[in-house]
Structures are given as C-alpha cells and as structure tokens.
C-alpha cells in the first residue's frame, strides 16, 4: 500500500494537471467559436464558386485548350496528396484519423500501380506519415508551424500545386483533411482538386428554361479566359475552406479531449482521496492497537 506522503503527492499532481486541462478546454472552446464561424462563413462562397464554374465548364471541358486544372493531364499515373492536419497534439484521435486516411489512400493507389507524392500541411500529419511513407513526402511544408493560416497561405499553397502541375510532376491532386461536422464529430475525407470536380450545373445555372429549351449565354471575355482566372482562385478557396474546416475540427477535438481529461482527473482525485483516507484510518487504527497492546502488557 502506498504511503500517505506518496498519496498526497499524487493527489497534488493530479489536481495540478486538472487545472491545466480545464484551462486548455476553455481556450479551445474560445478558439472553436471563432474557427466555426470562419468555416461556416466560407462555405457559401465556396459553394457559389462551384456553381459558377459549373455554368462555365460545360462548354469548355471538351476543348483541347481547356485549363489543366479543369481537365488534368489526361493521365492517371502520379497522384499528389495534400494532407491537412494540426501542428499540436492533445486533440484525441484528430491527427491520427487524418494520417490513417492518407496512408490508406496512398497504399490503395500504390496497390493499383500508381506513384504517390505527399505534401503535408501541419507537423502531425508529417510525423505520422514519416513512419511508413517517408520516401513519398515532399520536402516543402511551407505552412507548417504557423499559428493562424490566412487565405494568403492557401493561395501560396495553391500556386505551389499549380506550379507542380505545370511542371508535369503529377496528374491527379487530392486533398485529405478532417471535415467539421459538429463539436463531437470530425470525419476524415477526400476532395479531388485536380482535375477539378465541378458539379453538374443546375437547370437555372445552365440556362435551361421551364419548357426544356436551353438558353445560350455570351461571355465577355470567353469561357476559357474566365476559367483560366477562376479555376486558380477556386483551387485556393477549396484549400482555404479545408484549412478552416480542419482548424474548427481541431479545436473541437481538443476541447472534447480536455473535457474528458478534466473529468478523468476528477475521478482519479476521488479515488486517490478515498485511498488516502482509508490508509490514514488504517494507520490510526494500527497505532491505537499498538498503544492498547502495550498498555495491556504493562
């Protein structure tokens, strides 16, 4: 049985840890509100951009001069995975889940005979993937280590991806990140960036009238010029949206993890306090028995 001094030390240590986890929970909750608002504000803009591209892409996709971001290279040999994670831990399985999803996707692609390259945003994804896929990791992780990622950072990353596409370094680019569903639910998912997966235009966007006739629009400048401008912007927007979703998911996961840690610390303090009191009572009882036995011996 542990001594009273050791038990007091453990109780003090756990109480100190409980204060830290409680403070981290409150900080994560504060950051979550801001991150959630930013993620929700970005969704309508990103969705509207997709609708706009859908209205333009129908007439351009089959053109030999269509932008490469839209149609890709025409091959499916080399895949670039852009994996977004956090720089910090203490967020439950948040980073492990996205790292596992990226590893599963990479292994599946390689089993199909494809070459995989990985660009990570966030230290935790890089640390996780280095164990099994170190040779596939690209050296640049320019966004890792930043406390706050702005749209300019997403734009810089999209420009880096576009430059690699123009250099012929990959054929398909896929974004892997944690979708923010709710405070208690963040699920890893994939979004293909290149070739751009533009949704089918809705009838109103495509210019279809109520009698089935399709309206013809004239664009100034032409569709290809507009797409050449909009597609890089859309690439940056989709990356930024994923960064915001991942940030909101990270803070939610950390808040939940710290809440669980605080509760567990409270339970441990109760158990240790009970053990301490029982040990103290046992020591008092033993001392009383020794005193009584000594008195009887006299």
UniProtKB/Swiss-Prot annotation:
The lineage of its organism: Bacteria, Pseudomonadati, Pseudomonadota, Alphaproteobacteria, Acetobacterales. It is found in: Cell inner membrane. Pfam families: ATP-synt. Belongs to the ATPase gamma chain family. One of its GO terms (molecular function) is ATP binding. This is ATP synthase gamma chain. The keyword DNA-binding does not apply. It comes from Granulibacter bethesdensis (strain ATCC BAA-1260 / CGDNIH1). It comes from the Bacteria.
